[in-house]
From Swiss-Prot:
Gene behind the chain: ubiA
NCBIfam families: ubiA_proteo (TIGR01474)
UniProt keyword list: Cell inner membrane, Cell membrane, Magnesium, Membrane, Transferase, Transmembrane, Transmembrane helix, Ubiquinone biosynthesis
Pfam family, one: UbiA
GTP-binding in keyword set: no
CDD domains registered for this protein in UniProt: PT_UbiA_COQ2 (cd13959)
GO molecular-function terms, A-Z: 4-hydroxybenzoate polyprenyltransferase activity
Catalytically driven reaction(s): all-trans-octaprenyl diphosphate + 4-hydroxybenzoate = 4-hydroxy-3-(all-trans-octaprenyl)benzoate + diphosphate
Similarity comment: Belongs to the UbiA prenyltransferase family.
Protein name, entry field: 4-hydroxybenzoate octaprenyltransferase
């Protein structure tokens, strides 16, 4: 239904689908992976009752900034994507969208996002510049370091402190446990993503944690996921979350165990499916948080 709605945009403009693909609106999993942790933080900051205003700001902001991140990522990789089987049909790699068009779209998306942030408070506005810097520099990190996934983890976690400051005007130390947990989790699932492209990346000189970890990749991934769950458990103690939250963590742990088992072959398509599967873990944790606060009321 959602995909058919997007495809119908071609009737309005013949190039609409190129820009939809550039923003990855046709592939919402990345948006979910950014959205669920942001909502964890928003729900906890609001003690289960986030304002409608902040829900709108952060849900819309996640969609816009994820789209902006995809645009700048494709600009950065436009000369590499054509050499990677999974990405060679992307709009910029295939020459269907120019660099100027991409930067114009990026500016529009960032401008709309900043307009939303201006509806919050000064502290959140200041924090938003960090989010922009991380989103803009992440795509270029894979040329210089084997840890681009860490930068992505920081980018995908930056909305969490912003959620606290927007909802409460303050940033408690405990909020950084959520930040660290999500950063660790992001490094883990994006390593699965990088494992799917590892052979091509080695040929063209792109760096990633998948290449760095080598044959220890799956063990390190499951260790990172375990540490993420431990940080969430500590955060749950500090924020006085109960059994529903713990059930969400158990379900997430089950998701991680399934991914570890399924990726024994390390086949690219299997690793990519493991990456996609992570959004269910994030959703399970969110459901646990929501239900925990709802049953306390």
């Amino acid at each position: 239904m959602y995909l058919k709605l997007l495809q119908s945009c071609n009737r309005l403009h013949p190039r609409a689908w190129d820009f939809i693909q550039l923003m990855r609106l046709d592939k919402p999993i990345g948006t979910y992976l950014l959205l669920w942790p942001t909502l964890w933080a928003l729900w906890i900051a609001a003690e289960g009752v986030p304002s409608a205003k902040n829900l709108f700001i952060f849900i819309t902001g996640v969609i816009l900034m994820r789209a902006a991140g995809c645009v700048v990522n494709d600009f950065a990789d436009r000369n590499f994507d054509g050499h990677v089987q999974r990405t060679q049909a992307r709009p910029m790699a295939a020459g269907r969208v120019s660099s100027r068009e991409a930067w114009t779209l990026f500016a529009v998306l960032v401008g709309l996002s900043f307009g939303l942030v201006l509806l919050t408070n000064a502290t959140t506005v200041y924090l938003s510049f960090g989010a922009l810097a991380l989103a803009a520099c992440y795509p270029f990190m894979k040329r210089y370091t084997f840890y681009p996934q860490v930068v992505l983890g920081a980018a995908f976690s930056w909305g969490m402190p912003m959620a606290f400051t927007a909802e409460t005007g303050s940033l408690p130390p405990e909020a950084w446990l959520l930040f660290i947990a999500n950063l660790l989790w992001t490094v883990a699932y994006d390593t699965y993503y990088a494992m799917a492209d590892r052979d091509d990346d080695l040929k063209i000189g792109i760096k990633s944690t998948a290449i760095l970890f080598g044959e220890a990749d799956r063990v390190i991934i499951v260790t990172l996921q375990g540490l993420a769950l431990f940080c969430l458990l500590l955060a749950g103690v500090r924020f006085e979350l109960g059994q529903w939250f713990h059930l969400g963590l158990v379900i997430a742990a089950g998701c991680f165990a399934w991914e570890f088992w399924k990726t024994q072959s390390r086949k690219p398509q299997v690793c990519f499916k493991a990456f996609l599967h992570n959004h269910w873990a994030g959703l399970a944790i969110l459901a646990g948080i929501v239900l925990d606060y709802a049953t306390k009321a």
